[in-house]
């Protein structure tokens, strides 16, 4: 009721953000789940499927081309619809064209063509996400509204993930895989229509855009200006980066190591698919909604601290599951805890990232912070894998909990006087 009430008071654009988030989440799972699953059905080996996932690398490198989105104006589209909406429409139209590649071609037919199409889809989808992130920061007119914008975007993204995984599987069983890709194109086609229905945001600072392609000097100048502006606004920038790294530990390590643990404990594929994927995503949506609401009630800093502390329950529950062994009830409690924490803390940390950005180059700033967060997730997952090889599961997740608690020390070092 709280969210519905907020929409009704001249905030209808939040519904647009939710729907655009749904498209983004659906595309994300198309790349990371749907196509790999179809390849698994076709008996492709795990090493091939693993290499295919590299086609999604543009998601980790958004910062590389975000300066172009901040500085360059696409002829006609940006002058007609505004900078953010123009870029959004361009990226969505390119995304639709890329997806049509799977209409006359099955991903199982040629692995090299599949990788190429997925890479193009990833690039277009990542570009769309850069623009939407900037829109969610620039469009709101208050801190509370900013929290709502990221909450609605997060809920939409999770719904899209649910539709792109469980929904895609059901459609493939009832019809076929080609119908799944037709549905994907239809859903993505809604993107430009939604963008046309929402207003162009007012930049937080004066923007100096150009219709000429920026040169290498201008490109690095945008990145340099973004970092300098970020450093000027945030005196303890290095400590903030360390805080983000430690904050992700309670989320990234259990997420990366949960599948090996569950298989070691002899949970079935059906149990993992239904409880971990379908039910887990639903709980994630609930957690994300509550996280967004909390940030509007008690402020972003207190919400970040609360989310981080609650997040510590995730590795603790996996430790208990490792001690107990195969137990469906404990498994459900563990997955409920983990996914609630991911949704709850994930939404709050996204709002926190948005609050750090305040310059002419918002898309670049947010991409820098989000890219660091993504790299942190990858590094933590890799370190977790190495440690898990030498430690029993219960001790591993206990150490994970202790390590994750270090974020509290860094948080109070940076924000102790502001709480």
Curated annotation (Swiss-Prot):
GO terms for molecular function: transmembrane transporter activity. The keyword Transport applies. Pfam families: MFS_1. The gene is ampG3. Coiled coil: none annotated. The chain crosses the membrane at residues 12-32, 48-68, 86-106, 111-131, 155-175, 178-198, 237-257, 274-294, 304-324, 330-350, 368-388, 392-412. It is a multi-pass membrane protein. Keywords: Cell inner membrane, Cell membrane, Membrane, Transmembrane, Transmembrane helix, Transport. It is found in: Cell inner membrane. It comes from Rickettsia bellii (strain RML369-C). It comes from the Bacteria. One of its GO terms (cellular component) is plasma membrane. InterPro entries: AmpG_permease/AT-1, MFS, MFS_dom, MFS_trans_sf. Its main location: membrane. Gene3D superfamilies: MFS general substrate transporter like domains (1.20.1250.20). This is Putative transporter AmpG 3.
